[in-house]
Amino acid sequence: MSDNDKPKLGMRAPLGLKRTVETGQVKQSFSHGRSNTVVVEVKRRRIVPGRPGEAEPQVTEETAAAPVAPAPAPAPAAQAPVAPRPAPAPIPTGRPMTPLERREQQERLLREAEEARMAALEETRRREERAKAEATEEERRRAEENRRAEEEAERAAAAAAAAATAEAETAAAAPREEAPAAAGTAEEAPRTSSSTMPPPRRFTPVPSPKRPEPPRPQQRDRKGDDRRQSGKLTVTRALDDDSGARARSLAALKRAREKDKRAHQAGTVQQKQVRDVAVPETITVGELANRMAERGADLVKALFKMGMPVTVNQSIDQDTAELLVTEFGHNIKRVSDSDVDLITSDDVDAAETLQPRPPVVTIMGHVDHGKTSLLDALRGTDVASGEAGGITQHIGAYQVQVKSGAKITFLDTPGHEAFSEMRARGANITDIVVIVVAGDDGLRPQTIEAISHTRAAGVPMIIAINKMDKPGSNAQRVREALLQHDVQVESMGGDVQEVEVSALKKTGLDELIEKIELQAELLELKANPDRPAEGTVVEATLDKGRGAVATILVGRGTLKVGDIFVVGAESGKVRALIDDKGRNIKEAGPSLPVEILGLSGVPSAGDQLSVVENEARAREVAAYRAGVIHQKRTTAAPASLESMFSALREQKAQQYPVVVKADAQGSVEAIVGSLNKISTDLIQVRILHAGVGGITESDVSLAAASKAPIIGFNVRANAKAREIATRDGVALKYYDVIYDLLDEIRAAMAGQLGPEYLEHVVGRAEIREVFSAGKHGKAAGLLVLEGYIRQKLRARIMRDDVIIYNGSISSLRRFKDDVPEVRAGLECGITLEATTDIKPGDIVETFEVEERERTL
């Protein structure tokens, strides 16, 4: 374009007589993509004739920069050079502009600048739209070329492989001759030079020579530069001689294919997959969405339409979940949380699988009637001498082999009243109950309770009348006393067997064994040993070196080392089995008591043990049972908590907090039950924590927060716990006999309540006259009706049988003399402390207060 063809700047200005100032915009480009737009002006100046010898005046154009160039082409182009600045022209000497002309000129310049800016913006927008359209078209064209190239490459490779198989002799020369033809058919557009294209790869056994890396393309304009490494060999580059052209990546090809696939499937309706959704009693919205394979937002939206504003983390009930499942077209399958638990009541063994098993015999009776001594005589051991206080405080399980070769399993239960739950548990897991009655003591409360437990369990009983070696023993008196409780022995025409024994002299033991074997034969005790084991926890402890240890009485099946089991809310794997003699065994059959190691925690006595198939199932069942226990505890808490706070508000009940630690779970139950029984309406025992094992630092910290003592039953505190207890002032109380424990706790609770005060009324008098007593206020003239009135006694005034004053007598006079005491039938005058509200006819009662030590 020549200089004459350049468009003039500011041609859109209106015509006028004034000199015009042509303006425009020039875009300056810098490195790193920076640019700047400059407004330029073109002024015409007239040069007046100068001195002689100077050139003729001529009109020149002075520009600051070149006008705005059109949009650059995609090909790289150099930046337009800036025109050289001419020499400065002399200042014109014409007349100066008036203010009106100057203002018009400024307005015109502003208008022209705005028009130029708008034109530049419009041009920029058109240029961007053009570039976008070209890029879209280029992308579509390249995708089409790549697709055709891939198809041609596949066809060429297949044809080359077929040709190589048919002509085996010329397999090496044929590819070089046919390479130009194959390359020519691979592309529809003409190529620049076929000799520069590398030969295509042939699928022949001959190894192809190493292909040289194509040269790096020249620097392109940023709009045309793909900014990718060009050393990667692709199918398109192998079949295309234009190695510098941009090639699409594999990810871009995959995206394009997915887009085409979605476009083809847009017209077809996909079939919704109907699922069977298992819905428990409560489920979160997010979990329900996962089971339905739906989006959680869709479920939340559906619930909002139902009027339930919830989030994906909130729980909904089973009925609401059913509405959602039905609305989304799925099938609901209602499940209950209890389905997770093990159900063994319906599991009945076939008759042909049953084999005889030893009987389980429980020894029950009153404390100190000789139960453990009798069992020691049967076993040939001496357990009773090693027990604290000479009383049994745990359930002991033993298996004895008698002279006939048969085996009998014995359970020794405590006789103290605090161990009622242990005796009831022993009666429920036994086959035969032997009730021991001392011949010199007769029937006692725990003996009667043992008879009741036996009847409730529905098991047969045998009466063993012990201590027959003592001079004062009378077996006939015991038999007659049993009749009062509907127990008729065989010697008196009944069906209950009885035997007279002496554990000390070991007499009558053989007869007792014979009666047990006879009763067991009548019961026909059988069990299936070839099945997963089931049993009952007799006792559970926490050993410092072995961890949680439970004594299990196997009911049916065979418990083996390595079995995975669930017991109550605990699970575990059998690491060791120890029998009653302390020997490690590999397996335990029916009716055999064993200690098991490997529990995750200490179970409760009486929990059922069941062997399961794997650890996941065991953890699932244990977690469900723990949740049930926690739910029961939390749901029962509000009522008791509310009643406790209401009692505290009314100052009716005090709290005596304690922390209980014992050596066995059964002992914990007995202690907690006994402490709750000694609570009264005035003071109640609050169990902060009750557990099995030694006293630890956490127990001391818990007790220190509530200023509570720690009760250790057959356990001790470690060194660190003792140090913290001394520092925080926590009382550590150790016991090994439950009698002493209950007596001391009862005394401590009574001491916290303080002494009780009893009132004894000693006199009654009637006020006959009221008169002034100077500084004492008012004095009352009395007639003593009953008893006596003494100075400094406590007194109360009653008016119409309502107490209106409670205080003490400050002075007592008869006539004008102070007297210490006035008896019935005499008159006197008194003044009372801090009251003047007395009238004739009121009754005065005097009483003494007796302080007495409180007992529970």
From Swiss-Prot:
Keywords assigned by UniProt, alphabetized: Cytoplasm, GTP-binding, Initiation factor, Nucleotide-binding, Protein biosynthesis
What segments bear the compositional bias annotation Polar residues?
22-38
What is the annotated localization of this protein? Cytoplasm
Q: Where is the composition biased (Basic and acidic residues)?
A: 100-150, 210-229
- Domain spans labelled tr-type G: 356-526
Region of interest: G1: 365-372
Q: Which residues bind GTP?
A: 365-372, 412-416, 466-469
Region of interest called G3, as start-end residue ranges on this chain: 412-415
Annotated Gene Ontology cellular components are: cytosol
Region annotation (G5) ranges: 502-504
Q: List GO molecular-function terms, semicolon-separated.
A: GTP binding; GTPase activity; translation initiation factor activity
In what ranges is there compositional bias, type Pro residues? Answer: 83-93, 197-209
Q: Where is composition skewed (Low complexity) in this entry? A: 156-196
Q: Gene3D superfamilies this protein is in?
A: P-loop containing nucleotide triphosphate hydrolases (3.40.50.300), Translation factors (2.40.30.10), Translation initiation factor IF- 2, domain 3 (3.40.50.10050)
Region: G4, residue numbers = 466-469
* PROSITE patterns reported in the protein's UniProt record: G_TR_2 (PS51722), IF2 (PS01176)
Using the UniProt annotation, give all residue ranges assigned to the region (G2).
Answer: 390-394
NCBIfam families per the UniProt record, alphabetical: IF-2, small_GTP
- Family (UniProt): Belongs to the TRAFAC class translation factor GTPase superfamily. Classic translation factor GTPase family. IF-2 subfamily.
Q: What function does this protein fulfil?
A: One of the essential components for the initiation of protein synthesis. Protects formylmethionyl-tRNA from spontaneous hydrolysis and promotes its binding to the 30S ribosomal subunits. Also involved in the hydrolysis of GTP during the formation of the 70S ribosomal complex.
Q: Please name the PANTHER family in this protein's record.
A: TR-TYPE G DOMAIN-CONTAINING PROTEIN, TRANSLATION INITIATION FACTOR IF-2-RELATED
Protein name as annotated: Translation initiation factor IF-2
Q: What is the lineage of its organism?
A: Bacteria, Pseudomonadati, Pseudomonadota, Alphaproteobacteria, Sphingomonadales
Q: Which gene encodes it?
A: infB
